[in-house]
Amino acid sequence: MERIVVTLGERSYPITIASGLFNEPASFLPLKSGEQVMLVTNETLAPLYLDKVRGVLEQAGVNVDSVILPDGEQYKSLAVLDTVFTALLQKPHGRDTTLVALGGGVVGDLTGFAAASYQRGVRFIQVPTTLLSQVDSSVGGKTAVNHPLGKNMIGAFYQPASVVVDLDCLKTLPPRELASGLAEVIKYGIILDGAFFNWLEENLDALLRLDGPAMAYCIRRCCELKAEVVAADERETGLRALLNLGHTFGHAIEAEMGYGNWLHGEAVAVGMVMAARTSERLGQFSSAETQRIITLLTRAGLPVNGPREMSAQAYLPHMLRDKKVLAGEMRLILPLAIGKSEVRSGVSHELVLNAIADCQSA
């Protein structure tokens, strides 16, 4: 069992990583006997895990209600959020309730925002079931729903009480979802840890076959890096922005193509190549390093070119609505070397469009 602590003073919390955690009531601390829980999951995961998690919580004396959401990025919306509020109010659940998010990034982000908003804030626990959510979205307190004009535009910073990562969940993950998660894994190597990127080049095949020790190390290292960044910059005023490598471009793809048609990790993979091409055009990143990124993403089963039906010009309106925009100016996360990156302002739209075009016709 691995345990990492996100250090945020009195709001610090543990990330527990192991197999078989759904069999152990202690995995769901700080829940105690007699407490009330609303378990939020989706229609795909409910048949796999709902009864198991409900059973282990009830074994610990916890009173469990549940709400099952439709599955898909297109349901990360205010309308679906309202169904969670309605379920909480109908029981009713008070301010002493705990929301448990059992699912991937959509369930985790939406449940976290529900917890931040319901009666001005209730406790919640993240139980991520996808690789992407285990290494990224469940850690750090970013909660949100989407708007038709932009991804994650309505949300709050709100930290969980704990994160429970059961590695056994990955055994039921479709290959496309596994690849999507690997995009976020590769991101950490590009922006923060060149040695980890090297390790990924050597061990990607082991990750693709869900080798236990390799996957445990991979998730632990990603969570360590995320925890360090969040502890230093919880509300993304500086360092934490680096975690958005590829996201400015990627969110544009997701919004333009319709939420759910491209998985988040697929869009981020293309976005990271576009960021690398932008950095190349600025003369601060080598084509050889871009090729290393492309090769690793391709081996992981991820796209490296943007959708053909989306013109370079179609990216700009979405990118100019990005949450990192300041004074109307885009701020891009760009690699400087494998393992080093920067936040860059003042890049001309023409250069960005040319970098996007590099990835459309490649």
UniProtKB/Swiss-Prot annotation:
Obligatory cofactor(s): Co(2+); Zn(2+); NAD(+)
Record has Metal-binding as a keyword: yes
Coiled coil: none
Pathway entry: Metabolic intermediate biosynthesis; chorismate biosynthesis; chorismate from D-erythrose 4-phosphate and phosphoenolpyruvate: step 2/7
Positions annotated to bind Zn(2+): 184, 247, 264
Keyword Mitochondrion attributed: no
GO cellular component, one term: cytoplasm
EC code: 4.2.3.4
List of residues binding NAD(+): 71-76, 105-109, 129-130, 142, 151, 169-172
Any one GO biological process: chorismate biosynthetic process
UniProt subcellular location: Cytoplasm
Pfam families (alphabetical): DHQ_synthase, DHQS_C
Keywords per UniProt: Amino-acid biosynthesis, Aromatic amino acid biosynthesis, Cobalt, Cytoplasm, Lyase, Metal-binding, NAD, Nucleotide-binding, Zinc
UniProt catalytic activity: 7-phospho-2-dehydro-3-deoxy-D-arabino-heptonate = 3-dehydroquinate + phosphate
Enzyme class, first EC level, given as a word: lyase
Disulfide bonds listed in the record: none
GO MF annotations in UniProt: 3-dehydroquinate synthase activity; metal ion binding; nucleotide binding
Bound cofactor: record note: Binds 1 divalent metal cation per subunit. Can use either Co(2+) or Zn(2+).
Family: Belongs to the sugar phosphate cyclases superfamily. Dehydroquinate synthase family.
Purpose: Catalyzes the conversion of 3-deoxy-D-arabino-heptulosonate 7-phosphate (DAHP) to dehydroquinate (DHQ).
Name recorded for this polypeptide: 3-dehydroquinate synthase
Species this chain originates from: Escherichia coli O81 (strain ED1a)
Origin organism lineage: Bacteria, Pseudomonadati, Pseudomonadota, Gammaproteobacteria, Enterobacterales
Gene: aroB
